Every structure is written in C-alpha cells, then in structure tokens.
Amino acid sequence: MIEGRVQRVGFRASCNRRALDLGISGWVRNLSDGRVEVQAEGPPLALSELRAWCEVGPPGARVVRVTPSQLPITGDDWFEVRY
C-alpha cells in the first residue's frame, strides 16, 4: 500500500511503465480511501527497485508511507493498471 498524495498525479501509469521496464508482473490500482495498491512479482532486485521508485513516485506525488506485505505468487506474466 502506498499512502500520501498518490492519486491524480499519474502514479498508476508511471508505476505501470516502471514495472514493465523492470520485467515485473502484477498490477496497480487506486483505492477509494486515497491510497494506491500495488501487487508485484519478479526477481528480488527488480522488486527492490520498484519499491524504491514507489517510495518517491512520479513528479507531483508526495509519498508518506509504503507498506509491503507478502502475498501468494500468482504466476502472471504481465503488469496492468486496474480500475
């Protein structure tokens, strides 16, 4: 979960591009409470790089907190923006 000013700043689209560049699969979506949720699978180094990016976000974002959690692996081979 990503908290702060993370909606209406292009966070989902930018996260999608970054994940694809890193070869990560999963998804990103806005939540009704103003947070952004990301589910990502990939090599540990790529996941670390995506997390580091999420801690800053795109221009205009002000990330306050990134809360990671372990989820079951889905085996998906794409990354998408969910609505």
Swiss-Prot record:
PROSITE patterns: ACYLPHOSPHATASE_2 (PS00151), ACYLPHOSPHATASE_3 (PS51160). Gene3D superfamilies: 3.30.70.100. It is an enzyme of class 3 (hydrolase). Residues 1-83 form the Acylphosphatase-like domain. Its EC number is 3.6.1.7. It holds the Pfam family Acylphosphatase. It catalyses: an acyl phosphate + H2O = a carboxylate + phosphate + H(+). Keywords: Hydrolase. Belongs to the acylphosphatase family. This is Acylphosphatase. The lineage of its organism: Bacteria, Bacillati, Cyanobacteriota, Cyanophyceae, Synechococcales. The gene is acyP.
